[in-house]
Design a protein with these regions (language model features):
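Membrane-proximal stem/loop segments at transmembrane-domain junctions that anchor or position
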Residues: 370-506
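Short helix- or helix-capping micro-motifs
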Residues: 251-262, 310-314
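Specific aromatic-rich, kink-prone transmembrane helix
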Residues: 277-294, 310, 590-594
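Transmembrane-helix motifs of polytopic, lipid-linked glycan transferases
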Residues: 223-245, 283
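Short acidic/glycine- and proline-prone juxtamembrane loop motifs at membrane-interface regions
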Residues: 266-277
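Membrane-interface alpha helices of multi-pass inner-membrane proteins
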Residues: 302-317, 329, 352-358
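Membrane-interface anchor segments at the N-terminal boundary of transmembrane helices
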Residues: 35-52, 216-220, 465-562
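Extracytoplasmic catalytic/substrate-binding loops of multi-pass membrane glycan-assembly enzymes
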Residues: 167-179, 187-203, 211-212, 216, ...
Length: 604
């Protein structure tokens, strides 16, 4: 009895010692991610650091025993994710502060390791606590009647109506005016997805043609989009009740999340193609999950819907094509490794390839019908353009006279001096597609040669142009200083907000309009601790990535495969022109699905 007591006491002392050591490591490791607010001494020589240490010791002393006694697999995955998270936090802090990461600074790697050691037991605990909470969340009484699809759809749509009237006729922003101009001028290009150009511009121009005015056309498009987007979100909630046993109370919570959290109504009334694109991606992912759980039901009822959603996903955004095509081999490989039913896996591959063929055929027909011009390369070359411009700005001596001459052939000096590390729009608009097309090999070689000499400059050019997608503390203000039709971007460019010509804003609820203006253009929600993270693309991605890593830990490989289009879509925006919420809207839409996907299937 005494031996057992001594053993327990030693274990307790050991756990406490572990908690103290790891807490100190984590407190020191946080120095790198806190330095963004100023000199690191403001953190290291502060009472706040002591509070962090004290609270960490208490928390870790409660959970470290469970982590240390967990399986080797759990520890490995926890350390992998924690290391990646720590690296993201440290690099992101440096990029936010100085638009640069010093990869030769050994302290960076030391701080990354220390913080990773601290985060690992916390990550492990969150995985376990999350699974326990989900099992309680998805328990439904046998006699409990949930909400049906139409009820959920109506509730979400109605909750969005005040925002629609506050921003009436809708937020006609981003590429909307360009797409409308293509329609009225009958001069089309492949720069924007033709299907969306014809749909948006066609509805607005038709309203003008029959005498109702552009505002009516924009309002009609907005209401139709609200109907489609709310229907897809309603389908997601209804499916969670039908398949996972989500009870009525938690259905209502999901409805309120979709109906009231500002990002959803904000993009429901926004004319950008991203809203309908996101709706299609969500349907594709949900149906992929259904396929992995019940293939026979999928092929009996849902395969046509899957093909339709897949085709429209590719029609609405070009990077949707890249993500979808990349997902085919990813799903195939995971399916083979995980020993998924070969017949059903083959049928899924055929459906996905068929969807791609239908997309190509549809897009080609639209191109022929509209005589759309092609031959633009700057969107695909956004990152190389930024990399060359960064070297030109910070290390111009790298270029020889001949290389400088070649650079000016595709990027005139007047544009090179406009280099902005966080957005490439102005710079890439000066890219000479014709010159590049004449000798791609020469200019590709120029890019490669300069990169071999300045690899860290290239790496920083890419990271600073995309870090907001994986770093939670970035203030999204990529358009700062840009004059728009009705305002100038100053402190924030979180959302476009305005109604551009040919539309005109007529708000019925000015106070609500003011709230959304604050969210969009000012440091409003960013000033509120914790709440600010819910609006941050980087934070939402960390939640998504942590969930995926948890699925891998639990060997739920087919669920990982089902989410692969979202991960691959996220990967494509890392190669994009800038950092905006609209490009990763799917990360918020997928949250309720993530919450419930660990629950066992329940027949309702």
């Amino acid at each position: 009895m005494s031996d057992q007591s001594d053993k327990t006491k030693k274990s307790h002392i050991s756990d406490n010692a572990y908690a103290v050591i790891v807490s100190f490591a984590g407190t020191v490791g946080m120095t790198g991610i806190m330095a963004v607010v100023g000199d690191s001494i403001a953190y290291t020589n502060s009472f706040f650091a002591f509070i962090v240490f004290g609270l960490s010791v208490y928390v870790l002393s409660q959970i470290c025993s469970s982590f240390r006694g967990s399986s080797k697999r759990n520890k490995v995955f926890a350390y992998i994710f924690s290391t990646l998270l720590s690296l993201a936090l440290h690099m992101g802090a440096s990029l936010e502060k100085s638009a640069n990461v010093n990869f030769k600074d050994l302290k960076l790697y030391l701080f990354v390791i220390l913080l990773a050691v601290y985060l690992a037991p916390l990550v492990s605990w969150l995985w376990k606590a999350g699974s326990d909470s989900i099992s309680k969340l998805t328990v439904k009484k046998n006699d409990e009647k949930g909400l049906d699809f139409k009820q959920i759809w109506a509730m979400i749509f109605i909750l969005w109506l005040p925002v629609f009237f506050a921003l009436y006729p809708g937020a006609f922003v981003y590429d909307a005016t360009e797409e409308y101009t293509e329609v009225i001028s009958r001069s089309f290009s492949m720069h924007h997805p033709l299907f969306h150009v014809l749909m948006l511009g066609g509805i607005v121009h038709l309203a003008e043609y029959i005498g109702l005015g552009a505002n009516t056309g924009i309002a009609v498009y907005t209401v139709l989009q609200m109907a489609v987007f709310s229907a897809v979100l309603a389908y997601a909630v209804f499916r969670l009740a039908q398949k996972k046993g989500l009870n009525k109370k938690h259905q209502l919570i999901a409805i309120l999340f979709f109906g009231l959290f500002p990002i959803f109504p904000m993009y429901a009334v926004c004319s950008a193609k991203d809203t309908l694109f996101t709706a299609c991606v969500l349907v594709v992912v949900i149906l992929l999950i259904d396929h992995m759980e019940d293939s026979e039901e999928f092929y009996g009822k849902k395969r046509v819907l899957f093909v339709i959603a897949s085709v429209f996903m590719m029609l609405f955004r070009n990077n949707g094509v890249y993500a979808y095509i990349a997902a085919i081999p990813v799903i195939a490989v995971i399916g083979i490794v995980a020993h998924f039913d070969k017949k059903n896996l083959s049928r899924l591959m055929i459906l996905m390839l068929l969807s791609f063929v239908l997309y190509k055929g549809t897009n080609h027909c639209l191109k022929i019908a509209t005589h759309a011009t092609d031959g633009e390369y700057q969107e695909k070359l956004t990152v190389p353009i930024q990399q060359l411009a960064r070297v030109y700005k910070y290390a111009p001596e790298t270029f020889s006279d001949e290389e400088l001459k070649q650079l000016y052939e595709i990027l005139p000096e007047d544009y090179l001096i406009t280099y902005n590390p966080r957005i490439s729009d102005i710079l890439k608009s000066g890219f000479d597609n014709g010159a590049y097309a004449k000798d791609k090999a020469k200019y590709n070689r120029l890019w490669l040669d300069i990169g071999m000499r300045k690899p860290y400059v290239y790496l920083n050019a890419w990271l600073v142009n995309s870090y907001g997608y994986w770093y939670p503390d970035m203030i999204i203000n990529v358009y700062g200083g840009n004059q728009m039709y009705t305002f100038m971007y100053e402190d924030s460019s979180y959302f476009g907000f305005e109604t551009e010509p040919p539309g005109e804003r007529h708000s019925l609820f000015p106070l609500l309009e003011r709230l959304y203006r604050n969210i969009s253009l000012e440091l409003f929600q960013q000033r509120v601790p914790v709440i600010s993270m819910l609006f941050a693309p980087g934070f939402v991605f960390i939640l998504f990535a942590g969930h995926l890593m948890g699925l891998m830990k639990d060997k739920k490989w087919m669920l990982v495969a089902a989410y692969s289009p979202v991960l691959l879509l996220w990967a494509t925006v890392l190669l994009g022109p800038t950092i905006l919420v609209r490009y990763v809207l799917i990360l918020w839409c997928i949250i309720p699905v993530l919450v419930c996907d660990r629950a066992e299937k329940i027949k309702v």
